């Protein structure tokens, strides 16, 4: 439900228009000095209102850590992270109480929770709930970086604009496409879509470097299963593929297999079509996966819906502040959430000790 993880667990709480959102981390290694500036940097990458290309709901997204630290170091008790909601306008959502938005979870929440559903701003199924994912995941990401493990995500495509090259840092570009030409084209597309009152989707690629081999379990607890389980908690994510994914279905075995080789006395593979995972277990090569993020369902174009009280067809035009391309703000969410999963897997496998350190 609201808890993720095995040896290290994260529980999220709050809702889009509640007092706050947050996360509780239980099982994080003891004695780690949390780099608060680093955490806040990733919150800024995700923060709404930071660009004309994102939702204009302006939030500070400052993370408060109210437990789990002693003199700046993790002390073994649960870390509690809180992000206050300060820019809430619930009146925008009065219409969707009876008229569910097409493509949104309004209707399925009605089926499950009935009159008790939290519909304002999407409630606890809002994209706002990715803020605590970034807060918790960025701490895990900082820990992994201390081990030399790098987790990087970027926009591979937005609509029909595809970026097949990486020529810069994704966060240096407004669209998170790591190339100046692609960034400019994608920005123009988003502005055009936004002017029309519509939205557009995108694809996010992720690469994990320097992750050790031999991590993961076969069958139901494979590395792919663990990552996918977490990634699908991000609203609007509808697909994931590892390595070459669906392209493998049209390849020959002689093409899809990754031949083994030696490099500096270490076994490596010449290619990486399988994305660094075989049999659910990492092989020491970079972990690669891609996700598809659908267009934001809240758009300013009139759409047909059905009134839940009268059972009559009607039309809804969504009000409020919404992302024309929500995939852009999902990039740091994917990075941080992946980092949390990978650190949990490393703790499970014994690659990470419960103690980051016992002395300062």
UniProtKB/Swiss-Prot annotation:
Natural source organism: Thermoplasma acidophilum (strain ATCC 25905 / DSM 1728 / JCM 9062 / NBRC 15155 / AMRC-C165)
GO CC term (a single one): cytosol
EC identifiers of the protein: 4.2.3.5
Catalytic reaction list: 5-O-(1-carboxyvinyl)-3-phosphoshikimate = chorismate + phosphate
Ligase recorded as keyword: no
Keyword hit for Amino-acid biosynthesis: yes
Protein name in UniProt: Chorismate synthase
Assigned protein family: Belongs to the chorismate synthase family.
Pathway participation: Metabolic intermediate biosynthesis; chorismate biosynthesis; chorismate from D-erythrose 4-phosphate and phosphoenolpyruvate: step 7/7
Cofactor: FMNH2
NCBIfam families tied to this protein: aroC, PRK05382.1
GO MF annotation, one: FMN binding
Gene name per UniProt: aroC
PROSITE patterns in the record: CHORISMATE_SYNTHASE_1, CHORISMATE_SYNTHASE_2, CHORISMATE_SYNTHASE_3
Superkingdom of the organism of origin: Archaea
Keywords: Amino-acid biosynthesis, Aromatic amino acid biosynthesis, FAD, Flavoprotein, FMN, Lyase, NADP
GO biological process terms on file: amino acid biosynthetic process; aromatic amino acid family biosynthetic process; chorismate biosynthetic process
Record: residues binding FMN: 279, 294-298, 321
